[in-house]
UniProtKB/Swiss-Prot annotation:
Gene: CHST9
Bias (Polar residues) ranges: 108-128
Biological role stated in the UniProt entry: Catalyzes the transfer of sulfate to position 4 of non-reducing N-acetylgalactosamine (GalNAc) residues in both N-glycans and O-glycans. Participates in biosynthesis of glycoprotein hormones lutropin and thyrotropin, by mediating sulfation of their carbohydrate structures. Has a higher activity toward carbonic anhydrase VI than toward lutropin. Only active against terminal GalNAcbeta1,GalNAcbeta. Isoform 2, but not isoform 1, is active toward chondroitin.
Name of protein: Carbohydrate sulfotransferase 9
Cytoplasmic compartment residues: 1-12
GO MF term list: chondroitin 4-sulfotransferase activity; dermatan 4-sulfotransferase activity; sulfotransferase activity
Length: 443
């Protein structure tokens, strides 16, 4: 054969490459199918072995939604995998200093200390036992008691057996009028429904003093610092209310709050302890909060609230004010308060009492007022059997050289506001005005 005959023309080269390519592709597809069949066969064989040996995949507990009614809680427990142990009390708690959102609800449960978590988990993976059934029924009993709890909490007649002095007769009459007024208001406008899921937020501002069986709801700018001093003395944490510093009162964490207890503890205390709340004219309380937090140096309120308020409500603000947040004007503060799109959330110092203490849910046994604070507080102390030498302190906790915020001071702050702005402030706090029978002389 001549060398010239061995040379393939381009057409033959193309056909040869095409044939080899098709053949290679078919071979690859065949091998892939064969490998998959082999792998599937092994998997099926393993499954058969595991089924015959009684093995099954673990189904973990589904996460509990944040906001649940009591009925949903019970349904959730019932529908869990029966091979798993649901602890009697599992507790989920969230602390937040600011009331930035309208507060998500906390579902409280508490891990049992009688057995370790790993031990409980290992025991629960078998078939249900009588012990497990009993524990599950016990958990349901707690939730059933919670669901049957009357909302609002029942109001109880005050025990006046320890009040011997006739000088308190007028105070007693005033107290009965306040209680009756609040009770009638709540009957007419309360509208309570499905509040079980909000229980732990509802009681988050309530302090507990077990020795004298007191529940006190903290309302900032209504004598709360001195009330917490009194609770510390009653708890045996101090010998005198006059020797406790501001920082020890607010940052010492010496006092217990009601939301730190389990469901049974909360339920029992709400229905057996004397529940007290002290309130103040909403406009006076608002001005007092502004003076305290924005007219004096403050390492928290100026950078957190002041900067945001100045940035949004002050046109052409200077750089220094935007950096340090100092010098907020009352009118700017009011614009922030009334803004439905606030640049920073609410704070307990100017939050409504209706949202701090929930008077129509808790049904307080004692309603004190800042306007008659010393008289109301000392009558209350005598009524609960406090030591005779313990009197409510009347000193100003902070900025003692400043004049106390009263009606005359409030008028000076309101004079720069329009009538519409003053009306809007009233509208914002109208529930507090109505619940506690405050008039509106500043409009």
């Amino acid at each position: 054969m001549q060398p010239s005959e061995m040379v393939m023309n381009p057409k033959q080269v193309f056909l040869s490459v095409l044939i080899f390519g098709v053949a290679g592709l078919l071979l690859f597809m065949y091998l892939q199918v064969w490998i998959e069949e082999q792998h599937t066969g092994r998997v099926e064989k393993r499954r058969e072995q595991k089924v015959t040996s009684g093995w099954g995949p673990v189904k973990y507990l589904r996460p509990v939604p944040r906001i649940m009614s009591t009925e949903k809680i019970q349904e959730h427990i019932t529908n869990q995998n029966p091979k798993f142990h649901m602890p009697e009390d599992v507790r989920e708690k969230k602390e937040n200093l600011l009331l930035n959102s309208e507060r998500s609800t906390r579902l409280l449960t508490k891990t049992s200390h009688s057995q370790g978590g790993d031990q409980a988990l290992s025991k629960s993976t078998g078939s249900p036992t009588e012990k497990l059934i009993e524990k599950r029924q016990g958990a349901k009993t707690v939730f059933n008691k919670f669901s049957n709890m009357n909302w609002p909490v029942d109001i109880h007649p005050l025990n006046k057996s320890l009040v011997k002095d006739n000088k308190w007769k007028k105070t007693e009459e005033t107290q009965e009028k306040r209680r009756s007024f609040l009770q009638e208001f709540c009957k007419k406008y309360g509208g309570v429904s499905h509040h079980q899921s909000h229980l732990f937020h509802t009681v988050s501002r309530i302090y507990v003093e077990d020795k004298h069986k007191i529940l006190y709801c903290e309302v900032p700018k209504a004598g709360c610092s001195n009330w917490k001093r009194i609770l510390m003395v009653l708890n045996g944490l101090a010998s005198s209310a006059y020797n406790i510093s501001h920082n020890a009162v607010h940052y010492g964490k010496h006092l217990k709050k009601l939301d730190s207890f389990d469901l049974k503890g909360i339920y029992t205390r709400l229905n057996t302890y004397t529940k007290a709340v002290f309130v103040r004219d909403p406009m006076e309380r608002l001005v007092s909060a502004f003076r305290d937090k924005f007219e004096h140096p403050n390492s928290y309120y100026h950078p957190v609230f002041g900067k945001a308020i100045i940035k949004k409500y002050r046109p052409n603000a200077c750089e220094e004010a935007l950096i340090n947040g100092s010098g907020v004007k009352f009118k700017e503060f009011i614009h922030y308060l009334l803004d439905s799109h606030r640049p920073v959330g609410m704070d307990i110092h100017w939050e409504k009492v209706s949202k701090l203490c929930y008077p129509c849910l808790i049904n307080y046994d004692f309603v004190g007022k800042f306007e008659t604070l010393e008289e109301d507080a000392n009558y209350f102390l005598q009524m609960i059997g406090a030591p005779k030498e313990l009197k409510f302190p009347n000193f100003k906790d902070r900025h003692s050289s400043d004049e106390r915020t009263n009606a005359q001071v409030v008028r000076q702050y309101l004079k720069d506001l329009t009538r519409t702005e003053r009306q809007l402030i009233y509208d914002f706090y109208y529930l507090d005005y109505l619940m506690f029978n405050y008039t509106t002389p500043f409009l």
